[in-house]
């Protein structure tokens, strides 16, 4: 693979990762389709995906640094509150409660979960995750009991964590599962999305660092430029995607995202079957 070709592939996959990682559309489904079409598969590709995920995580840290510092008791002066946004009064206990179910289940069934990573299971997860988004929009309370992060209860945080377990099914979408769960628990669409992003930092960071440690032997000096391009691209695109997404969900429901998931599921079927 030529240097320019590999850098182009890195940029394309970085864009795909950045756009889809935190949207409820399944980054896994998109990555396996695009990776297959580009002919970029195997151990190096898996290591590359782990590295560019770190770029996406960094985007969340940059976007929510104030709230993240607040979790450990460090508070900074806040700008004037905008309508519909949370005040960021979240505690570390909320995050821990949101993490526990998926961490426990992930450790206990690690090998089983890894065995589910194939196109057919991803396709089914895309469909079921889309149905959950529709259910969340149809069944959510008319008036959210927790319009902002500061209104969330420990019980709601734990239940969102239980819904996050669905994301252990490859292709389901971690953000799709947690946001849907939050809405069904009476958290507003916006606050559920914010909590999903904050919850992603420790969850994804832990999983990504572990995967990177296991995949370190596949990383060579020759791959560094490609990995760097993918990392930076994923970071920049994820930053834009998160900002756009948070503005968009103030105006539209998640139904369009559900329909899009069905389209991606059909694409997986066409490409792999």
UniProtKB/Swiss-Prot annotation:
It is an enzyme of class 3 (hydrolase). It comes from the Bacteria. GO terms for cellular component: plasma membrane. Pfam families: BacA. It catalyses: di-trans,octa-cis-undecaprenyl diphosphate + H2O = di-trans,octa-cis-undecaprenyl phosphate + phosphate + H(+). Coiled coil: none annotated. GO terms for biological process: cell wall organization; peptidoglycan biosynthetic process; regulation of cell shape; response to antibiotic. Its EC number is 3.6.1.27. Keywords: Antibiotic resistance, Cell inner membrane, Cell membrane, Cell shape, Cell wall biogenesis/degradation, Hydrolase, Membrane, Peptidoglycan synthesis, Transmembrane, Transmembrane helix. The chain crosses the membrane at residues 54-74, 90-110, 116-136, 156-178, 190-210, 222-242, 252-272. One of its GO terms (molecular function) is undecaprenyl-diphosphatase activity. It is a multi-pass membrane protein. It is found in: Cell inner membrane. PANTHER family: UNDECAPRENYL-DIPHOSPHATASE. Belongs to the UppP family. Bacitracin is thought to be involved in the inhibition of peptidoglycan synthesis by sequestering undecaprenyl diphosphate, thereby reducing the pool of lipid carrier available. Catalyzes the dephosphorylation of undecaprenyl diphosphate (UPP). Confers resistance to bacitracin. This is Undecaprenyl-diphosphatase. It comes from Salmonella paratyphi A (strain AKU_12601). The lineage of its organism: Bacteria, Pseudomonadati, Pseudomonadota, Gammaproteobacteria, Enterobacterales.
């Amino acid at each position: 693979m030529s240097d320019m070709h590999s850098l182009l592939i890195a940029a394309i996959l970085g864009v795909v990762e950045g756009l889809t990682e935190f949207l409820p559309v399944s980054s896994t489904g998109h990555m396996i389709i695009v990776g297959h079409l580009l002919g970029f598969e195997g151990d190096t590709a898996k290591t590359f995906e782990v590295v560019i995920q770190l770029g996406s995580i960094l985007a969340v840290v940059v976007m929510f640094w104030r709230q993240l510092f607040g979790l450990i008791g460090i508070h900074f002066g806040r700008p004037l509150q905008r309508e519909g946004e949370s005040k960021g009064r979240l505690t570390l206990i909320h995050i821990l409660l949101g993490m526990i179910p998926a961490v426990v289940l992930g450790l206990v069934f690690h090998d089983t979960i890894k065995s589910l990573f194939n196109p057919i299971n991803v396709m089914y997860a895309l469909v079921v995750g889309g149905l959950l988004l529709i259910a969340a929009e149809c069944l959510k309370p008319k008036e959210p009991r927790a319009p902002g992060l500061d209104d969330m209860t420990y019980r709601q945080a734990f239940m969102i964590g239980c819904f996050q377990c669905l994301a252990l099914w490859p292709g389901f979408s971690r953000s799709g599962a947690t946001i849907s769960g939050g809405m069904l628990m009476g958290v507003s669409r916006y606050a559920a999305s914010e909590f999903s992003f904050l919850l992603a930092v420790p969850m994804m960071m832990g999983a990504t660092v572990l995967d990177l440690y296991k995949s370190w032997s596949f990383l060579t000096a020759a791959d560094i430029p490609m990995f760097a391009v993918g990392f930076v691209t994923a970071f920049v695109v994820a930053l834009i995607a998160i900002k756009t997404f948070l503005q968009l969900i103030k105006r539209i429901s998640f139904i369009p995202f559900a329909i899009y998931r069905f389209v991606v599921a059909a694409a997986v079927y066409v490409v792999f079957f």
